[in-house]
Amino acid sequence: MTDALLPAAPQPLEKESDGYFRKGCNPLAQTGRSKLQNQRAALNQQILKAVRMRTGAENLLKVATNHKVREQVRLELSFVNSDLQMLKEELEGLNISVGVYQSTEEAFTVPLIPLGLKETKDIDFSVVLKDFILEHYSEDSYLYEDEIADLMDLRQACRTPSRDEAGVELLMSYFIQLGFVESRFFPPTRQMGILFTWYDSLTGVPVSQQNLLLEKASILFNIGALYTQIGTRCNRRTQAGLDGAVDAFQRAAGVLHHLKETFTHTPSYDMSPAMLSVLVKMMLAQAQENVFEKICLPGIRNEFFVLVKVAQEAAKVGEVYRQLHTAMSQAPVKENIPYSWASLVCVKAHHYAALAHYFAATLLIDHQLKPGADEDHQEKCLSQLYDHMPEGLTPLATLKSGHQRRQLGKSHLRRAVAHHEESVREASLCKKLRNIEVLQDVLSVAHERSRLKYAQHQDDDDLLNLIDAPDIISKTEQEVEIILPQFSKVTATDFFQKLGPLSVFSANKRWTPPRSIHFTAEEGDLGFTLRGNSPVQVHFLDPHCSAALAGAKEGDYIVSIQDVDCKWLTVSEVMKLLKACGRDGVEMKVVSLLDFTSSMHNKCATYSVGMQKTYSMICLAIDDDDKTDKTKKISKKLSFLSWGTDKNRVKSASTLCLPSVGVARPQVKKKLPSPFSLLNSDSSLY
């Protein structure tokens, strides 16, 4: 595992040096977060077992003809569905366990919602990568055992990242490393036989694919999830802590947005475009909530202009949470979003709307227009507080009339009390929220404050007050926005750089096996020139020179001279090696690039145990409505993320099947765009 800078030429990877290995958290440490993640992993296994049982029972019910057997299967199926519902509720309880992720400092604040990390299974890269190194690169695969072990160690460390910037760098370094691995070992025309399995963070349903893009997308999701955990951990009683929380949630939104735009068809609910859009909105809403807390942190002075600003800031938070709750209530997100999340979002929407009306009431009731006050400025602020004044009222007349100010202020208090009552009611309807004591305390204190304020100014003729408080225009001094991930700031060394420069020695290109060329320089003349950077190519080859007669060809890449690896050497360095050879001649190994084979997407085998239709499945099902019945029958047999047909698939070659000299691979028509490459923001499919 490494996080070192990429040198100009490959250097020995010093494992003893500081910073080479970047480890995750101790998986055996009994912290609150690790216990929660272990419970999530155990629940995922139980959900997998239950889903398999349900799938088997449904299949048996389809083929069974005996009446008693069918009745027994229906009974068992009802039990399995009941178990699945209970497991889903347990997983929802883990997703709303916000107390574990909050700051250790005691704070009287509304809790924030973090995302849990996606769980995965162990993967053994060694056999597949060793076979490919021998088959494709014609090198001794045992020379790369340490590099393969480093890759597997890095992946294992990413399962338990630390909840800080080092943990984010760890995940990002693995994501970048996956780009190197994809280019080196995953040709677009075949599958490598490595099954990647990841569990849905929201439903616990496992999804498996023989495709590295599932791994990359899941790592991106975990980067966003880790940012949310960092944001909830920040101390919200300090200015620096709130700044860190705002930044973390904006970065989480940026990572999830990048995931949505890059991986457009994903086989799990938590990474579907609709769900990711909602999660991005949720992160931005929580960032906006922290902006409001930053304004209130020094204390809210009971001044007219300060109260106008705070009221509009609170209205902004309430507005974004109201929009988020509307998005959560739409299909297909509604069926899979945790109910406790939607309830908490609804509670916050009413809570901050109530605060906005409370501050508006305070500025109207507690402040009178005094002689010498900035009358024009107050009139302008009051007119900008509403999109329209209540019927029969004008800003200036309201400011000058104490009776109108009190009547309008009390109407704001009535709306504030109504919103508080609704937030308390919503919180009481959700069992998970009832167990969050700090949330209940915040809601009850705010409700009591508004109720007492109204009771102080309540008159007997309030029933005759027909003024209806208008909505408050939302406004903020700091509009939150997504911060896209900056992978360029976290560079990593390619573990397999000994294979050669990635621009030439990649899985997309094929060469002849290395050929030994033994020749002598006649009177210091090699018979050819050199060109290129790394690796160096044979250029302007004299067909009658000793090298050409020994088998060298125009355009050959020089990979070694006198058993010295030359794949990373420049022209001047290779020329020094050639001139240093004595009278015994030059022993040189070269490879020839075969005809370029156009890349074609491999057919992606998706395995999802009894998973219901995802967002992507629903979209593709709609696209198929206009097709014929015959086409529909054929399409059902294929993966919904298929690339190409069976006849275009290239059978995986054996370890002993080395590329033959001079035999070019047939041209394959390119049907789809190239798959997602490293740091490429273009849209792509699995």
Curated annotation (Swiss-Prot):
GO CC, sorted alphabetically, is: cytosol; perinuclear region of cytoplasm
Q: Does the keyword Glycoprotein apply?
A: no
Q: What superkingdom heads the lineage?
A: Eukaryota
Outline the extent of the REM-1 domain: 26-100
- State if Translocase is listed as a keyword: no
Q: Using the UniProt annotation, give all residue ranges assigned to the region (Interaction with Rho).
A: 46-66
Concerning CDD domains, the annotation shows: BRO1_Rhophilin_2, HR1_Rhophilin-2, PDZ_rhophilin-like
| Domain BRO1: start-end pairs | 111-460
Q: Which InterPro entries match?
A: BRO1_dom (IPR004328), BRO1_sf (IPR038499), HR1_rho-bd (IPR011072), HR1_rpt_sf (IPR036274), PDZ (IPR001478), PDZ_sf (IPR036034), Rhophilin-2_HR1 (IPR049603), RHPN1_2 (IPR047138)
Q: What are the subcellular locations of this protein?
A: Cytoplasm, Perinuclear region
Phosphothreonine modification sites? 655
Q: Where is the PDZ domain?
A: 515-593
Induction comment from the UniProt entry of this chain: By thyrotropin (TSH).
Record keywords, A-Z: Coiled coil, Cytoplasm, Phosphoprotein
According to UniProt, the tissues expressing it are described as: Mainly expressed in thyroid.
Protein family membership: Belongs to the RHPN family.
What is known about its subunit structure? Interacts with GTP-bound RhoA and RhoB. Interacts with both GTP- and GDP-bound RhoA. Interacts with KRT18.
Record function comment: Binds specifically to GTP-Rho. May function in a Rho pathway to limit stress fiber formation and/or increase the turnover of F-actin structures in the absence of high levels of RhoA activity.
Entry protein name: Rhophilin-2
Q: Which species?
A: Canis lupus familiaris (Dog)
